[in-house]
């Protein structure tokens, strides 16, 4: 595979024309079979694998030869469940063939994406979801509209094959891909007659389809935005003394009219910022309401024409930042005005200037989180803590660790918000619910539990790791921590409670559009 990568770098055209012979290389299926045994691409537990299962590469070659014929593609999924690509009871042959197919298709994609990423200086790859918020903190105050767009994930299999056809010139190598996609499309459990491509599937094949699909969407969308934008050279140019920004712009426009009309467009052109996490993307726009409507229309039209997809209107929602809050990534996102008083002394005179700046302000959704805690039986509807009866059969350490994990995840995820006072109400509910759960387990009261286990039990054990995470505990430092944001680089996904609330918000938006 390494030699093939080097060979592809030297001659990309030859690399695209000779992918199909790789399906018959034994080394390829040795790699894919090792990946399958390691559990890197399958959700099947290792204890379900039979040690006496003899794997034959000749059998795999015969399966590859038969999969080219549409009528015999079912041979690939012998001894599999009706949904062969999603069920955990898969045969080693089908899994290895899918793994080998993925490895072959990843070769041209990895080379192309590497060259494309090298040409984009602003491209950054981060695993933590908190890496998005510093970008929003920098771009949101200069924007007045925000669009929350969800990428459509229901795709016809032929659309995926045609997308790969633009990249891979070797037509025979696409026959196995077409057979696999249509086999899954025609499975009895797939009622939508389309391929569901989502980034939450553990199968490496589906993860590759999702990454390639999103890459195609964004690469073409970015090229269209760059062509339509007149401020390509001005995008990264800093303006000094941003306090009197509008006054400087007006002065430059008057001066530019004497030279050329193009300079005026460079300064008047709106700014569009794009960021994506998973299947959700955020577009921050600085412009008029008409421009936002046009961007939304063109985005829906682009998906419909290029991918032949009907994208529902509720998948692209626009909000004005100064009036409404947008719910995304588990936060209420808004921009608030922050007044500043600046005193300047020149000789004997003292000048006081009032400056108003926009500030990115993510808000913690306390009320929705309390509703989710009530649904999970940590408290009632009014917010009174109750015992978690389903956990009374666990040990004391397991109960304490579970409550500790819930609070630690919530506190870490919302550490970037200024107003974290509402989180202490959640901490009180969780701590009292933990005490009631222990009391219910030992058939005693909270007072007896604290007397036996110690009055400082909850503060020492349950929340021992979340005491502001090594921040100084002085009063000044505690007050300063309320004014500072802490973005963590070790949060790979949205909190489960927060994700449930985000799904509820999405359903509300869908119901509004249905009405």
Swiss-Prot record:
Location in the cell: Plastid, Chloroplast
Protein keywords: Chloroplast, mRNA processing, Plastid, RNA-binding, tRNA processing
Top-level taxon: Eukaryota
GO cellular component entries: chloroplast
GO BP, one annotated term: RNA splicing
Disulphides: none
Record GO terms (molecular function): RNA binding
Function: Usually encoded in the trnK tRNA gene intron. Probably assists in splicing its own and other chloroplast group II introns.
Stored PANTHER family: MATURASE K
Entry's family note: Belongs to the intron maturase 2 family. MatK subfamily.
Name recorded for this polypeptide: Maturase K
Organism of provenance: Pinus cembra (Swiss stone pine)
